[in-house]
């Protein structure tokens, strides 16, 4: 499974490399903000300048992936074929490795048959193939860490080894440095673990404190760096209110309308340049809160649309939107089918005596996307949930076939 998954993604990477060599907007498609920050690191200016001009230190993104891209640039020479292929190869490796936790997660919660089918399904999973081989971004690494986190959380339910808690804390710390949104389910999963281990008569408080200390030790250097750079407590990143502003500004022509982001709006970019990063983020907070207070109905309506978009891929049938997004309708059918199969698989498992095993995964499915409902949603943002979705999609199909055969 692993080698097939890797080969498919590497083949797509080889085809997609020319896309990243386009000099449009100074190689903007080469990692977007992450590519700009990586170049700044290589040029000796540090973790800075996420947009088009030098703008000083930034905390708009977490550090792990930009430094990874910077390492590739340092080795292979900036925006080159070799650099693009190196980054895409790493993406492909991360995505292919995700087969392993997918297999063991399915085996632990469901059964061996589902684990094998889910592993092979992941090898050919379109979103994973595209996000690994068709984008220079952190999606594949984020998904790998997420799937390892989900698996390690389940292992802790009955584990007596302190080392498992250390690994858990380290994984959460790594998640914070790669994609802080992964930390969303942490308090809910921690409560679930405390309840489950208490029922089993197993210790949870001190091992949990130790895991929390490991997490803090992993992210602390980055938090200290942010405080020194901005004289403000910024634990991991500072872009939350900008993302809220993008989602709630009155423009629903797209999930992320061009009029609301500094990379696509001359007005927003001019404000960024004038105020600096911290001033800009403060301004977006003020603007977003004011707009939401003045338009509560709009906030509720767009939030509902974000929920629908997260689980079906659907946003709009406006001709101008569809012209810019030619795969929107096919993707909507595919994403909706995946969600329906997910619901079916969860139902089969829950009613089939696996409710306790399934519950923490349901908890993740509910809590992880919450931040995207109140900012803006996207299929790539949902990618950390895709291992769980693929597992239960496969289980739904297999269980339906088994029951149909039993009735025949």
Spans of features found by a protein language model:
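Short helix- or helix-capping micro-motifs
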Residues: 5-8, 115-126, 144, 151, ...
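Extracytosolic helix-loop segments that constitute the early lumenal/periplasmic catalytic or substrate-binding loops
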Residues: 10-23, 30-57, 64, 71-72, ...
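Loop-to-helix entry region of an early transmembrane alpha helix in multi-pass inner-membrane enzymes
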Residues: 59, 63-67, 77-100, 119, ...
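Membrane-interface anchor segments at the N-terminal boundary of transmembrane helices
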Residues: 86, 93, 284, 290-291, ...
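Membrane-interface transmembrane helices that cradle and orient dolichyl/undecaprenyl
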Residues: 109-113, 141, 149-167, 171, ...
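Transmembrane-embedded, aromatic-rich helix segments that form part
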Residues: 166-167, 180-196, 237
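Membrane-proximal stem/loop segments at transmembrane-domain junctions that anchor or position
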Residues: 227, 233-309
């Amino acid at each position: 499974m692993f080698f097939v998954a890797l080969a498919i993604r590497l083949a797509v990477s080889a085809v997609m490399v020319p896309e990243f060599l386009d000099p449009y907007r100074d190689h903007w498609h080469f990692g977007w903000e992450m590519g700009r920050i990586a170049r700044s690191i290589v040029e000796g200016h540090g973790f800075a300048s996420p947009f088009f001009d030098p703008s000083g230190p930034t905390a708009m993104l977490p550090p792990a992936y930009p430094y990874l891209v910077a390492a590739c640039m340092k080795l292979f020479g900036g925006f080159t074929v070799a650099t693009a292929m190196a980054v895409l190869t790493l993406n492909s490796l991360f995505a292919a490795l995700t087969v392993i936790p997918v297999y063991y997660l399915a085996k632990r919660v469901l059964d061996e048959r589902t684990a094998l089918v889910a592993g092979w399904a992941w090898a050919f999973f379109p979103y994973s193939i595209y996000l690994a081989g068709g984008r220079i971004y952190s999606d594949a690494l984020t998904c790998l860490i997420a799937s390892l986190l989900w698996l390690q959380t389940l292992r802790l339910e009955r584990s007596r080894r302190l080392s498992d808690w250390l690994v858990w804390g380290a994984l959460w710390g790594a998640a914070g440095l790669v994609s802080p949104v992964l930390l969303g389910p942490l308090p809910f999963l921690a409560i679930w673990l405390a309840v489950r281990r208490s029922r089993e008569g197993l210790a949870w408080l001190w091992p949990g404190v130790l895991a929390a200390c490991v997490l803090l030790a992993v992210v602390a250097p980055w938090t200290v760096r942010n405080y020194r750079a901005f004289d403000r407590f910024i634990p991991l990143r500072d872009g939350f209110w900008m993302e809220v502003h993008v989602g709630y500004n009155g423009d629903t022509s797209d999930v992320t309308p061009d009029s609301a982001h500094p990379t696509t709006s001359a007005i927003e970019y001019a404000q960024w340049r004038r105020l600096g990063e911290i001033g800009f983020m403060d301004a977006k907070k003020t603007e977003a809160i004011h707009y939401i207070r003045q338009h509560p109905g709009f906030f509720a309506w767009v939030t509902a649309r974000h929920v629908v978009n997260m689980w079906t891929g659907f946003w709009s049938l406006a001709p101008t939107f569809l012209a810019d997004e030619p795969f929107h309708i096919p993707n909507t059918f595919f994403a909706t089918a995946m969600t329906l199969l997910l619901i079916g698989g969860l139902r089969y498992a829950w009613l089939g005596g696996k409710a306790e095993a399934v519950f923490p995964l349901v908890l993740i499915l509910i809590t992880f996307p919450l931040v995207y409902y109140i900012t803006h949603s996207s299929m790539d943002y949902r990618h950390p949930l895709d291992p769980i979705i693929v597992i239960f999609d496969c289980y739904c199909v297999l269980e339906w076939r088994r029951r149909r055969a039993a009735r025949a």
